[in-house]
Amino acid sequence: MSKAHPPELKKFMDKKLSLKLNGGRHVQGILRGFDPFMNLVIDECVEMATSGQQNNIGMVVIRGNSIIMLEALERV
């Protein structure tokens, strides 16, 4: 069994990201931290509701297994 390697996310630190999550959820915010399981700490997080409404939800931890897609919104 191979050993898990930490995700290559250092280049995304302190950058604004767009995250697509399971359940059709979409959030944007600034990456402040991560761990080997790809759990992310996102600051200034904004939930983009399907109605077009934006909800500011502050600093959150997003569990790695709920992330479908991650996109940088700033040059890395």
From Swiss-Prot:
Parts of the chain that traverse the membrane: none
Keywords from the UniProt entry: Cytoplasm, mRNA processing, mRNA splicing, Nucleus, Ribonucleoprotein, RNA-binding, Spliceosome
Gene Ontology molecular function: any one: RNA binding
GO cellular component, one term: catalytic step 2 spliceosome
Primary localization: cytoplasm
GO biological process, one term: spliceosomal complex assembly
Cellular compartment(s): Cytoplasm, Cytosol; Nucleus
Entry annotated with the keyword RNA-binding: yes
Function: Plays a role in pre-mRNA splicing as a core component of the spliceosomal U1, U2, U4 and U5 small nuclear ribonucleoproteins (snRNPs), the building blocks of the spliceosome. Component of both the pre-catalytic spliceosome B complex and activated spliceosome C complexes. As a component of the minor spliceosome, involved in the splicing of U12-type introns in pre-mRNAs. As part of the U7 snRNP it is involved in histone 3'-end processing.
Record-stated family: Belongs to the snRNP Sm proteins family.
Subunit structure: Core component of the spliceosomal U1, U2, U4 and U5 small nuclear ribonucleoproteins (snRNPs), the building blocks of the spliceosome. Most spliceosomal snRNPs contain a common set of Sm proteins, SNRPB, SNRPD1, SNRPD2, SNRPD3, SNRPE, SNRPF and SNRPG that assemble in a heptameric protein ring on the Sm site of the small nuclear RNA to form the core snRNP. Component of the U1 snRNP. The U1 snRNP is composed of the U1 snRNA and the 7 core Sm proteins SNRPB, SNRPD1, SNRPD2, SNRPD3, SNRPE, SNRPF and SNRPG, and at least three U1 snRNP-specific proteins SNRNP70/U1-70K, SNRPA/U1-A and SNRPC/U1-C.
Annotated protein name in UniProt: Small nuclear ribonucleoprotein G
Organism ancestry: Eukaryota, Metazoa, Chordata, Craniata, Vertebrata
